[in-house]
Amino acid sequence: MYGIEYTTVLTFLISIILLNYILKSVTSAMDFIIYRFLLIIVVVSPFVKTQNYGINVPITGSMDTAYTNSSQQETFLTSTLCLYYPIEASTQIGDTEWKGTLSQLFLTKGWPTGSVYFKEYTDIASFSIDPQFYCDYNVVLVKYNSTLELDMSELADLILNEWLCNPMDIALYYYQQTNEANKWISMGQSCTIKVCPLNTQTLGIGCTTTNTATFEEVATNEKLVITDVVDGVNHKLDVTTNTCTIRNCRKLGPRENVAKLQVGGSEVLDITADPTTTPQTERMMQINWKKWWQVFYTVVDYINQIVQVMSKRSRSFNSAAFYYRI
């Protein structure tokens, strides 16, 4: 009897010892695997270029971050300035060294050599299709033209504000604008926009949905169109999609690192009629028309005052970003 009990106890002890050994072996193996895995991650991570998404961080539209205005009581040692001008300016000046001259003049106002970039554009229409703002501060010179007032106004609305945009499939869906901040923005070589408002039965109001000739034409052969229709009403659209793209956009607020200087004209164009547009005449300024050398001299003289009403930003803006966020 005692032999059986001793055997049982001995078997139990041996089982415990064996189990403990197995657990230690497994633990050691797991530690080896984990440490080796972590070592591989540490070694490989510098060479892997992937996006860190964080933990469910919501994206609310604009990813721009406003910095404290650096123009208050210091020189612009860490800031960049882009000056956009029409090609006619360089043509009239006719001096291959004029940019270097202006850079030296900007230096006298606290802008180090190499911090000011000169960006040339052909005309308002082409600039509207592909605006690119890569500097901390961006100043756009636009010469007034009475025949281009609409283009100038829409360009100002586009570049002086941030927009959140999504693609539109006008072949499959009807669209409506929910409020005054909601606009349809079209860009392209030639944009002709026609709309047909619909009633609750999706029948055309004053138009026939199957006949685009009966649609209301709101833009003809333009390169930039910001379309505003009656809110809360579905619309069938007809757009020259082979030469134009259209996006459903929402105005988020002012883009404060961009200013527009109108050269000439009796008064600066006003885009504040839209109730969603924060009064921004501070970033829409006017210079009386003179020779282009005189215009640039004026810009140099007042550049620090101009920058005072702007805010430095950390991200660039180009036309690709426009389609989803500007």
Swiss-Prot record:
The keyword Signal applies. Residues 1-50 form the signal peptide. Ca(2+) 1 binds at D95, G206, T214, E216. Disulfide bonds join C82-C135, C165-C249, C191-C244, C196-C207. Keywords: Calcium, Capsid protein, Disulfide bond, Glycoprotein, Host endoplasmic reticulum, Host-virus interaction, Metal-binding, Outer capsid protein, Signal, T=13 icosahedral capsid protein, Virion. Glycans are attached at N69, N145. Residues 165-167 are annotated as: CNP motif. Residues 237-239 are annotated as: LVD motif. N-glycosylated. The N-terminus is blocked possibly by pyroglutamic acid. Residues 253-255 are annotated as: GPR motif. Its main location: virion. GO terms for cellular component: host cell endoplasmic reticulum lumen; T=13 icosahedral viral capsid; viral outer capsid. Pfam families: VP7. It is found in: Virion; Host endoplasmic reticulum lumen. Ca(2+) 2 binds at Q177, D228, V229, D231, D301. GO terms for molecular function: metal ion binding. Homotrimer; disulfide-linked. 2 Ca(2+) ions bound at each subunit interface in the trimer hold the trimer together. Interacts with the intermediate capsid protein VP6. Interacts with the outer capsid protein VP5*. Some rotavirus strains are neuraminidase-sensitive and require sialic acid to attach to the cell surface. Some rotavirus strains are integrin-dependent. Some rotavirus strains depend on ganglioside for their entry into the host cell. Hsp70 also seems to be involved in the entry of some strains. Calcium-binding protein that interacts with rotavirus cell receptors once the initial attachment by VP4 has been achieved. Rotavirus attachment and entry into the host cell probably involves multiple sequential contacts between the outer capsid proteins VP4 and VP7, and the cell receptors. Following entry into the host cell, low intracellular or intravesicular Ca(2+) concentration probably causes the calcium-stabilized VP7 trimers to dissociate from the virion. This step is probably necessary for the membrane-disrupting entry step and the release of VP4, which is locked onto the virion by VP7. Belongs to the rotavirus VP7 family. This is Outer capsid glycoprotein VP7. It comes from Rotavirus A (isolate RVA/Human/India/116E/1986/G9P8[11]).
